[in-house]
């Protein structure tokens, strides 16, 4: 409840309005925490069976056709004041083939590469890569907007038509990054993925990537 309260407070403090906020939770009833924000933001609360993918799919199923862009957020994320307005600005200038744009997680160290890690096949010079070894290079704290091969499922804005066309199937993995890669990496082969440098968020979780 504490984490989602922080997230909703950061949405309340954004420098632009959002059209709809859908919270899907499992376990403890947190409707009292959620609905106290209803006076300030267009928030809705739903419950589901446990599982990040189940929660995300239920939220997506509730969307109507008027919603072109959908942000999928983990509950420990906190928006910077201009994160959404910068994201909208970025989307207004990308190619039509763009499927998703990630927020820039700025409180986690960004990509660091050295020749030895590269020799072992566990790193690459560029951020946002998926390597043959299965390792990924970081998409956090980028210093400029980048095109990438994977995106964080809990901090990305997708075109709704992409989410509808490619449902996020449940997988048995205790590692959230694995779920993110399985969903987003194939999209990078057909569409364009970015991380927007100016669209900044912070997260409480420590482990976001394999580096």
Please annotate each region the language model reported.
Residues 23-34, 77:
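A conserved acidic beta->alpha catalytic loop
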Residues 67-78:
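Short beta-strand-to-loop acidic/aromatic patch adjacent to the donor-nucleotide binding site
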Residues 189-211:
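Active-site-adjacent helix/loop segment of glycosyltransferases
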Residues 9-18:
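Short, acidic, metal-binding catalytic loop of nucleotide-sugar glycosyltransferases
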């Amino acid at each position: 409840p504490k984490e989602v309260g922080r997230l909703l407070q950061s949405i309340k403090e954004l420098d632009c309005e959002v059209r709809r906020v859908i919270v899907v939770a499992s376990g403890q009833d947190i409707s009292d925490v959620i609905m106290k924000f209803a006076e300030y933001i267009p928030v809705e609360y739903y419950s589901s069976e446990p599982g990040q993918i189940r929660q995300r799919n239920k939220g997506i199923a509730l969307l109507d056709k008027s919603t072109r862009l959908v942000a999928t957020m983990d509950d420990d994320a906190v928006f910077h004041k201009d994160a959404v307005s910068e994201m909208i600005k970025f989307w207004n200038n990308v190619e039509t083939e763009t499927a998703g744009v990630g927020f820039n997680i700025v409180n986690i160290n960004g990509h660091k590469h050295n020749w030895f890690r590269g020799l072992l096949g566990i790193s690459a010079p560029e951020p946002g890569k998926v390597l043959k070894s299965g390792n990924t290079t970081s998409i956090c704290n980028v210093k400029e907007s980048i095109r990438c091969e994977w995106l964080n499922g809990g901090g990305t804005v997708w075109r709704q038509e992409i989410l509808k066309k490619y449902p996020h199937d449940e997988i048995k993995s205790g590692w959230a990054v694995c779920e993110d890669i399985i969903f987003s990496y194939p999209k990078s082969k057909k569409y364009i993925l970015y991380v927007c440098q100016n669209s900044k968020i912070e997260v409480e979780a420590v482990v976001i990537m394999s580096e």
